[in-house]
């Protein structure tokens, strides 16, 4: 791997684990967690603030990290990923990796790139249409963005639909949609979202909301019932392949 670039990015973590969400659950990946996000979702379980250093897993899977100074340039990241072997792909996550599209565009790796995105930055997504093999795109429902003004929520929904259209499935790229379903999720909102992107994706994942913070002790206050999610799946199956898959890495206790 070689690349020359003056681009650099603030990265929070680099480590090896397995994909814990969606249709590729269980595949071995290197994870590059970028700092920074343009949203503030109610159920977010990730600290994505910019830090002066990046936590880098010294030996894949051993959970022992060393501090690497930020920002990290493209060539350095390629070098840091070299020791991780037998990978299905490299997951670009965050935060929001599309904030770093110019950086990602210059990456040259021997394995495919797997983008985990909130799908609200279409101009950034446009830059990566030829670079990404797997798109794990979220559809952030308006009720998940309660702290954002209503007009801004509408803009995010429009931008999400644009992103799915730009990064839609084709012969060289898989694209699927993940929708987090919680107690306050309105089924009619999920159906509208699914209708808007069904033709662009290989499947829709309904992900039961994972309790975070104090909600861990009282999950019934944040989680939708099994019956509710099953009923929603039945409706969406009229539009696209729809699966119910919780966050498996939380069950296993891995990163």
UniProtKB/Swiss-Prot annotation:
It comes from Methanosarcina acetivorans (strain ATCC 35395 / DSM 2834 / JCM 12185 / C2A). The keyword S-adenosyl-L-methionine applies. Its EC number is 4.3.99.3. Belongs to the radical SAM superfamily. 7-carboxy-7-deazaguanine synthase family. [4Fe-4S] cluster binds at residues 37, 41, 44. One of its GO terms (molecular function) is carbon-nitrogen lyase activity. This is 7-carboxy-7-deazaguanine synthase. It catalyses: 6-carboxy-5,6,7,8-tetrahydropterin + H(+) = 7-carboxy-7-deazaguanine + NH4(+).
């Amino acid at each position: 791997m070689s690349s020359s670039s003056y681009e650099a990015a603030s990265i929070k973590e680099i480590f090896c684990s397995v994909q814990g969400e969606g249709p590729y659950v269980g595949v071995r990946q290197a994870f590059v967690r970028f700092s920074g996000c343009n949203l503030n979702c109610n159920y977010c379980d990730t600290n994505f603030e910019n830090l002066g250093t990046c936590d880098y897993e010294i030996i894949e899977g051993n959970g022992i990290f060393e501090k690497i100074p930020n920002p990290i340039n493209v060539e350095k990241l390629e070098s840091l990923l070299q020791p991780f072997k037998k990978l299905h792909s490299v997951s670009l996550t965050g935060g929001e990796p599309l904030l770093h599209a110019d950086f990602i565009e210059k990456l040259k790796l021997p394995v495919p790139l797997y983008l985990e995105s909130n799908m609200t930055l279409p101009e950034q997504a446009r830059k990566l249409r030829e670079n990404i093999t797997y798109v794990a795109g979220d559809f952030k429902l308006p009720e998940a963005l309660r702290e954002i003004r209503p007009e801004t929520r509408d803009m995010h929904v429009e931008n999400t639909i644009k992103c799915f259209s730009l990064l839609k499935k084709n012969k060289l790229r898989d694209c699927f949609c993940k929708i987090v379903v919680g107690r306050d999720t309105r089924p009619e909102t999920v159906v509208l979202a699914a209708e808007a992107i069904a033709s662009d994706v290989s499947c829709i994942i309904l992900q039961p909301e994972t309790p975070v913070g104090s909600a861990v002790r009282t999950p019934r206050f944040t989680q939708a019932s099994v019956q509710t999610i099953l009923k929603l799946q039945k409706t969406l199956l009229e539009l696209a392949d729809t699966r119910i898959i919780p966050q498996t890495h939380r069950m296993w206790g891995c990163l």
